[in-house]
Amino acid sequence: MCGIFGYCNYLVERSRGEIIDTLVDGLQRLEYRGYDSTGIAIDGDEADSTFIYKQIGKVSALKEEITKQNPNRDVTFVSHCGIAHTRWATHGRPEQVNCHPQRSDPEDQFVVVHNGIITNFRELKTLLINKGYKFESDTDTECIAKLYLHLYNTNLQNGHDLDFHELTKLVLLELEGSYGLLCKSCHYPNEVIATRKGSPLLIGVKSEKKLKVDFVDVEFPEENAGQPEIPLKSNNKSFGLGPKKAREFEAGSQNANLLPIAANEFNLRHSQSRAFLSEDGSPTPVEFFVSSDAASVVKHTKKVLFLEDDDLAHIYDGELHIHRSRREVGASMTRSIQTLEMELAQIMKGPYDHFMQKEIYEQPESTFNTMRGRIDYENNKVILGGLKAWLPVVRRARRLIMIACGTSYHSCLATRAIFEELSDIPVSVELASDFLDRKCPVFRDDVCVFVSQSGETADTMLALNYCLERGALTVGIVNSVGSSISRVTHCGVHINAGPEIGVASTKAYTSQYIALVMFALSLSDDRVSKIDRRIEIIQGLKLIPGQIKQVLKLEPRIKKLCATELKDQKSLLLLGRGYQFAAALEGALKIKEISYMHSEGVLAGELKHGVLALVDENLPIIAFGTRDSLFPKVVSSIEQVTARKGHPIIICNENDEVWAQKSKSIDLQTLEVPQTVDCLQGLINIIPLQLMSYWLAVNKGIDVDFPRNLAKSVTVE
């Protein structure tokens, strides 16, 4: 939820028009995350002024607002920092006054964009109101901007002219909750602060010259930092302030009635960032792109650095410095600059009408990529590099706990049975929010598996921290390299599905499913009794991409069904049993979130325990009738439906004589899909429902990629 984007150019001349276009384009590439308003902040015409443009609605509405305000687009800047934001309302309605950026005062001295929720904002707001500050919005973010101004003025009055990152540390000390934020200020021209806690942030670096090293050092205070003192001087520069213009500091008395005054950290481990050193020591032209998502950066650069929780990034004078308040045992001393594997074409629609449609049709390729290089079909071996060293520990586990939300939860449900069958380890599947609410007991001999497409899901991250505190081994199954879950877990698997832009997860679901099956296969490769079963599954996986391609040919038939039998329906029932129960739940979720039609996935065995009361000739029903050990029971459940005048649509295997015979005497329709191994059949069966949800939505004129009230990456509780 929400999206942050920032752009800083240093010794790279850009017009105001180019800067605005870069910021707006960055926001457009964050649209899929979900939002209800947008805004940007850039330097104004005067030396200490800031232009803020914000608007409710789409990014296109913001572009119209900027055009209406008619700023001089031809003014050029050799160095400049601009920030931008797409907002998902958490505090305050979607109104222009609540849009980000939020300002500290009418003079725009400090301007902030923020993702997350500040849980103590009411206390902060009360404190600031008592000190005379007037609030314009209902947001928690405005508290941050005003807190910046208050602490800046307080320290200035007491003789402390703070560096931007020192001031930010004081602000962060007062904040509780989660945040990813950017701040710019007229007091610190051409500088920007980026910091995160529980909300993702990355920084892209673009330079014509090759970087000297592929990392940035983390800078810590010295042991005696925290004691106010007169700064040391070296070469006319304040020690610890790098190439910035020297500032004079004086130790002043603290006023007990004000928030804490800075104990200046003059003795910082601070030097020119090694990554940005030039051969002759002259400044290097460079551009920085700060974002909550790699999709908005890849157009400009593939060199990115992922911030970790409590990192404080300070960009100024063409350099990037990363500060932390304290050194933790075992913490990394650097942040590596990585190369994104994402291609620009992957986040473009191409010939498709919607990203969701594109991603449905990418599944033959995405499922193949999930398995690429990991399965040896000739020798029936599965090798997951990220798990290999940890498998002996996992095999000794007392139980496996799979924790996820939404679609990722369904992929866990879909594979629970095969985990139990192959490993003989009890497996529980938990919704992250419920897991936390119950304070579920977790022990050191448990293995906790966290599944998330984005790797940033807030509830899943909180559950992960909960399990780490209790000493459990943690495994991450994610699609986003460098995400929080991938960094914090002990080991894991990257599903390699490629960027997924549509809010409704399609290809990530099938890739998660396959990654979990491969995990189960790896876990059981030491069991002689499971060899035949493992070979059957591995050979079944080999055929999956081709079988998905075959199922996609059903689209014309499904499109027609959506335009006739399912048109204008208010509710839909999906029946599944065994491995297909997860498919029923996932199919129902897709139809709900994309077409806004009420749909319910039901365990077929529970039909007669209440759900059967809903069945009549008007209720559309979709049932999974593919072949497995539970097929006779599924047939029995469907016969109960038809006996109550129900007219089910059966997803069955090709050339199945049972359904062919029944269709002669019972009013039912079939959608035939290829047959595969029972534990993999859900991969094939979900494709028709993805297509069905898509066409139901398109026929209603719904924006498939941006369903109302939903966000792609849920980074708040």
UniProtKB/Swiss-Prot annotation:
Pfam families: GATase_6, SIS. The active site is at residue 2. Its EC number is 2.6.1.16. Keywords: Aminotransferase, Glutamine amidotransferase, Phosphoprotein, Repeat, Transferase. InterPro entries: GATase_2_dom (IPR017932), GFAT_N (IPR047084), GlmS/AgaS_SIS (IPR035466), GlmS/FrlB_SIS (IPR035490), Ntn_hydrolases_N (IPR029055), SIS_dom (IPR001347), SIS_dom_sf (IPR046348). It comes from the Eukaryota. Disulfide bonds: none annotated. The modification Phosphoserine is found at residues 253, 336. GO terms for biological process: chitin biosynthetic process; fructose 6-phosphate metabolic process; protein N-linked glycosylation; UDP-N-acetylglucosamine biosynthetic process; UDP-N-acetylglucosamine metabolic process. Pathway: Nucleotide-sugar biosynthesis; UDP-N-acetyl-alpha-D-glucosamine biosynthesis; alpha-D-glucosamine 6-phosphate from D-fructose 6-phosphate: step 1/1. GO terms for molecular function: carbohydrate derivative binding; glutamine-fructose-6-phosphate transaminase (isomerizing) activity. The modification Phosphothreonine is found at residue 334. Induction: The activity of this enzyme increases in presence of mating pheromone (transcriptional regulation). It catalyses: D-fructose 6-phosphate + L-glutamine = D-glucosamine 6-phosphate + L-glutamate. Residues 390-529, 562-707 form the SIS domain. CDD domains: GFAT, SIS_GlmS_GlmD_1, SIS_GlmS_GlmD_2. Residues 2-318 form the Glutamine amidotransferase type-2 domain. Involved in amino sugar synthesis (formation of chitin, supplies the amino sugars of asparagine-linked oligosaccharides of glycoproteins). Present with 14300 molecules/cell in log phase SD medium. NCBIfam families: PRK00331.1. This is Glutamine--fructose-6-phosphate aminotransferase [isomerizing]. It comes from Saccharomyces cerevisiae (strain ATCC 204508 / S288c).
